[in-house]
A protein has these predicted regions:
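Conserved AdoMet/S-adenosylmethionine-binding subsite of the radical SAM
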Residues: 2-187
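Poly-acidic low-complexity segments
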Residues: 1-2, 235
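C-terminal accessory extensions appended to soluble enzyme cores
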Residues: 154-240
């Protein structure tokens, strides 16, 4: 990381993110390695965000917390797509409530937590919005991110027949990680009303985890969504 020319060290530098494309706590043999890696990354002094859909032992959370250098250096996130159909859509994970309990344990250790409503499946997730909001408020989770659904034939098949998708809310969109690939995805403009509903219920909702990280640290988002007038910017007032 430090050898990357684009890496900026320090509190106001590059946000280090782990777990977006693979769960770092999925199996026991990866847990210790992941914890030790996060500790080494914390030592760099940069803001760090990592995520998991699995339950983490309190002793490991406490171990991590001891290395945090400043308030809000670390942001822990979990993901919820559905409360009622998680066994079908997210098999081999722990229940949404168990995931949020882990978020609460991080908060108890002084590490801010965030819930990714991601992917937000139009026709499924929106029908459970009140349940999700209730669960977040029950465990005092005050930050969440609503994420687009990227859909292919393989993904559609894996979701199963029980998952209903409102195809009217989809459009051709480029992947964030590769602008050369276009795939069916949720229209961001259709998600703004859900952002507003979370905020009306006292939950700070965004489209990007980096926005949560920037907000808790009161720094400009290095992704520059605000300055580029990007559709992901909700004009929360943080970036100046």
């Amino acid at each position: 990381i430090t050898e990357n020319k684009e890496f900026i060290a320090g509190k106001n530098g590059t946000i280090i993110s782990m777990g977006a494309w693979g769960d770092i706590f999925q199996t026991d043999r990866f847990i210790d390695m992941s914890i030790n890696l996060i500790i080494e990354l914390i030592k760099l002094g940069n803001p760090i965000q990592f995520m998991s859909k699995y339950k983490l032992d309190i002793s490991l959370i406490s171990k991590l917390a001891k290395y945090v250098q400043y308030t809000n250096q670390v942001l822990y996130s979990t993901t919820i797509t559905t409360i009622d159909k998680w066994k079908t859509i997210e098999p081999n994970t722990v229940s949404p409530e168990e995931r949020i309990k882990t978020c609460k344990e991080f908060k108890n250790q002084g590490i801010e937590s965030n819930v990714l409503i991601k992917p937000f499946i139009p026709g499924t997730t929106d029908l459970e919005l009140d349940k999700i909001i209730y669960l977040l408020k029950e465990y005092n989770i005050t930050y969440c991110v609503i994420g687009k659904l990227y859909i292919s034939d393989d993904i559609l098949k894996s979701l199963g027949k029980d998952c209903l998708i409102n195809t009217d809310a989809l459009e051709l969109s480029t992947l964030d990680c590769n602008g050369n690939i276009k795939i069916q995805a949720t229209q961001v403009k259709t998600l703004y009303k859900y952002i507003e509903k979370f905020r009306e219920n006292g939950i700070n909702a965004f489209f990007k985890s980096s926005c949560v990280n920037s907000n808790i640290n009161k720094t400009n988002n290095p992704s520059n969504y605000y300055f580029n007038n990007d559709e992901y910017c909700i004009n929360c007032g943080n970036c100046k």
